[in-house]
């Protein structure tokens, strides 16, 4: 049954394309800065850093399901952290050297929004830590 749930949440449609002015109007300045200009919110300031409620985290720009609370854990790094996306097809990655070292930016597949970064220092089995900006997410409790 879990497989069917993931298949239903995987996105396979057309991308959303909007102008910068439209995105700024839809998202507001703070979300726009993070999701379109690729900044980060301050550590431990985000709404979902300590949230333990069960549910689904979706893109604040297009509502695409991105992460499940089942994959969330407390890494104590200042941002919500997950071991994997809810469906691999729902995100994509770009190499990012903006901090002087190689890391991988995580973006929403549907609207190209910057979500955060993934690192290879997470818990076993996959050893991945998706470090995601709270402001790029909207949460729907189960």
What are these regions (language model features)?
Residues 14-20, 24-58, 64-142:
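A short Gly-Trp-Pro
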């Amino acid at each position: 049954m879990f497989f069917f749930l993931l298949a239903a949440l995987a996105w396979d449609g057309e991308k959303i394309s909007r102008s910068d002015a439209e995105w700024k109007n839809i998202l507001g300045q703070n979300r726009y800065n993070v999701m379109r200009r690729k900044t980060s919110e301050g550590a431990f300031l985000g709404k979902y850093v300590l949230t333990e409620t069960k549910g689904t985290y979706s893109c604040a720009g297009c509502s695409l399901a991105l992460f499940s609370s089942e994959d969330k854990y407390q890494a104590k790094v200042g941002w919500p952290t997950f071991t994997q996306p809810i469906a691999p097809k729902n995100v994509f990655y770009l190499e990012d050297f903006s901090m002087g070292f190689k890391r991988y930016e995580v973006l929403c597949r549907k609207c190209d929004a910057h979500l955060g970064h993934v690192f290879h220092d997470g818990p076993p089995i996959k050893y991945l830590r998706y470090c995601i900006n709270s402001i790029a997410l909207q949460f729907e409790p189960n």
